[in-house]
Amino acid sequence: MAYSGAQKALKSDKLDEAQALAKSCAGRPDFLPCDGLSICATHSHGKCFKLHWCCYLGWCHCKYVYQPMTNVAQLPSTPVPAAPSDCPDTIDLSISLTERFLRISPCFQAPPCPESPKYCNIAELFIDDYIVKRINGKMCYVQRPQAHVEPAQMNPIQKQHTEDKQIVEETVKGPKMGHCSSPSTSEDSGINALGGHFLESCEEESEEEDELSTDGHSSPGSLWDQDECTLLSPSKSMVEIIENIETTV
C-alpha cells in the first residue's frame, strides 16, 4: 500500500513538472503544438529540433532542445542576377596560370652559368712518372721512358720492326741494374729497368727464382730449356725476362 502510494506521488510530481514545463514552453514565440505522430515519432534529441508538445512522451521537448533551427527563408542569400554577366561561370585554371606566368616571366632572371670544371691528369700530380715492371719475379718501380716521335709515313710492319729494334738497342746500351730499390733512394728517382743481363738482381732473389722456374715463364733457365739452344743473346734474354705491367703509380 505504501509502495503504490509512493508511485502515485512520484507520477503526480512528474506530471506537475511536465505541465509546468509545457506552460513555460507554450509561452515562447517559437513553440509549436504537436501536429501528430509523424513529428513525435522522431523524438530523438539529435533529430527533433522543433519546440513542441510531444504527445508520445507526455511533456514538452524544449527541455532537450538547445537552440531552434533558423528558418531557411530567414537565412541571408546572395541575389542572383537576372541577366548573365560577361564573366563565364567556369574558368580554365591551366590557361589562367599560363597567362599569368607569361605576364610576369620577364621579371625572372636566368641563373648564373656555373664555371666550367677544370680537369687535370693524375700523372701531373706526381713529380716523377713511374711504371711497375716484373724483373726476374721481382716487382720494381721503373721510370717510364719518354715517348719518341715516330714518322707519320710508315707502314705498320716497318713500324713494329723499328720498335723491336729500338727496344733491343736500348737494352744493350743501358746500364746494369744491381738491385731493386725504392724510387726515393735511386739517383734518377727510379730504377732504370733497361739494364744489362739482369742476371745480377736482388740478393733475396735466388730462392724465388727456383720457385718461379717451375712455371717456365719467369726465370732465364726455364727459357733456355725451352729454346733448346746452347747460346742465347743477352738482348733476347732481357726482352723475355722483363714484363711490362699496365699498372701506373
UniProtKB/Swiss-Prot annotation:
It comes from the Eukaryota. The lineage of its organism: Eukaryota, Metazoa, Chordata, Craniata, Vertebrata. Residues 201-213 have a biased composition (Acidic residues). Belongs to the UPF0524 family. The keyword Chloroplast does not apply. This is UPF0524 protein C3orf70 homolog B. It comes from Danio rerio (Zebrafish). InterPro entries: UPF0524_fam. Pfam families: UPF0524. Disulfide bonds: none annotated.
